[in-house]
Every structure is written in C-alpha cells, then in structure tokens.
Amino acid sequence: MSILSYFQQQRLTLQSGTALPAAQSLLTLAGQGELEATLNPKPDAAALLAAIEQAYQDGYEQQASTEFELQGIAFAGSGDPLLALELLSQVLPAFKAQRHGVPVTLVTYGLVAAAEAEQLCQQLIALEVERLEIYLPAANPPAYQQAVKPLQYGFAEVCQFIHAAAEAGLQVSCFAFAPAEQPAEIRALARELGARELLILQPEK
C-alpha cells in the first residue's frame, strides 16, 4: 500500500512527488529508505487534502493550546517540494481556507537558479508558506558538492536562496545530518545568510 503522509518528529509530513535536484532524496540521507519505498510517487491534490483532514480528525495537534505551539504541516517526502509547485498551488489555498493560521513548512535542498530565487520566494509567500528547512551540509563549495551531488546548481545557489528567503520574510532554518563536517562553520554561514538556526539531525540507523 502506498501512503501520502507520515509523521517526522511528530509533525504531519506530506509526500510531494519524486522530482529531485540532487542524486538522493533527503529521506534516503536521513536513513529512511524503508519509509520512502512506501510513499505514493504521484500524489494528487485531492488525496493529499483528504490525508491532511484525516490526520486532524484523528486528533493531530489537539494538544496545542495556542497558534505558537502548532507545528502545522510540512511538505517533504521522496521529492523536493520546490519542484512540485503546481501541486502546492492546488493544495495550499484549500488547506489554508480550512485551517487558517496553521503553519506550512517546506523541507528542501533549496537548489534554485539565483535569478529565480526572489520571485520564487514571493510565490511561496503568496501560497502562505511560512517556513523553509533547507539542507546545508557544508560551508564551502567542494564539501557541498561531495555531500549533495547536485544535478543542477550548487553551493552558490543554495546560499543565494537562503539569503533571498530570509530577506523576503520567510522563517528559514538550515539542517544537516550527523556527523556533520565543520558544524561551527556551517552554523556561522547559515546565520550570516539569515537563517534562524542550524539543526544537526541524527539519521536513522
């Protein structure tokens, strides 16, 4: 059976297709290949909205007493949500109409053409995306190239996108998987670019 949603650190997370800008999915890097194998490769908007609604009916986030405690929903899965904008543009307006004030996060490589970064950020804001979690496993181009193996763009573009997103008013966090090389340098770079924090996540064994 293929699924459309799962819980990652207790947050409802949705599959966003299979298009990737790099050699491997972030789920694979997180050691979650088994989960990835169960995800529906071609999610459609109606099915995603139904999966979200079902999670809320089953009690998701009922413990949150204020908006500030809401984790909301995230788009991640076996693809990169920035390469699934058409799907997001079908899901998010309907979701926000039903659940106003619930935050939306995209978990992404952030590999975007520098010339398109600003416009893309405005598009995300128009879709009421509040947060971005961007994979930043290195603080220099060679180490980034080795860690990510991007199919298009690279270190300069991800740095530009982090900066553009923070400037546009999106809440940006960066993350890497343990054991990260030079975490202090990555954290300093992330902060310099405008990210709020660098999270070092433990991959599943």
Question: What is each stretch, according to the model?
Answer:
Residues T38-A47, Q63-A84, Q98-E116, V129-E157, ...:
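Core AdoMet radical
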Residues L85-S89, A115-I125, A184-I186:
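Distinct, well-ordered alpha-helical segments
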